[in-house]
Amino acid sequence: ENFSHTLEVLDNVAVAEVEAIAEGRLKDYVFEDGQEVAKVRTEPYVWLRWAALFHDIAKPSTKRYDPNLGWTFHGHEVVGAKWIPKIFQSLKMPLNEKMKYVQKLVNLHLRPIALVTEEVTDSAVRRLLFDAGNDIDDLMLLCNADITSKNPRKVARLKSNFELVKTKLVEVEAKDAIRNFKNPITGEYVMQLFGIEPCNTIGQLKEQ
């Protein structure tokens, strides 16, 4: 059941990403001349699909039966995220920002829908925006693709909740412009400090 769900999510992600790309709704962030630049995504990002493939990988290991709740999978997103480095290493996949991207989406894939309650605070939304950073749109796409219930009413409810989350994210983001925060340490400063030419390493040094 978990495997079939994963394949369905993977298929949903592939379809949704192609549609989003066609509408110019997704961006990729790259470093050019030491500066982070947002560019409209023009082709599918394979690592988003890897995130979809691995998002529930730890469910079997965290499966527990609760007399009141039935089967639960508490913490499967955290456990799954911890497994990602070893999985990538075993598959001889890159252990760089691509691995970290997949790890981030696996770890955060339950967070958006958890913001649905009326009691949710702006600070909780800010934390999600901060933790997801430039990958918030990919995370939301994955979260939406994860709605695969066979119950039409449940799907309608979850889709409605998801739209509410999107609205809350937009509202808080408009207030704080979190994703528009500019790191005071510029690419030029890093290049001068370390005596290096423009390259991807500059972005990594800025994060340090």
Language model features: what each stretch is:
Residues E32-R153:
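Divalent metal-dependent catalytic cores for phosphoryl transfer on phosphate-bearing substrates
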Residues V18-Q35:
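Helix-hairpin-helix/helix-loop-helix acidic hairpins
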Residues V15-A22, K59, K63:
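Conserved helix-loop functional segments at active or binding sites
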Residues I84-S90, S149-Q208:
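Charged substrate- and nucleic-acid-binding regions of tRNA-handling and nucleotidyl-transfer enzymes
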Residues E1, Y101-K104, T201-Q208:
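Short linear loop/turn motifs
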Residues F3, L7, G133, K159, ...:
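Electropositive phosphate-/nucleotide-binding environments in soluble metabolic enzymes
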Residues E1-E19:
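Long, charged alpha-helical interface segments
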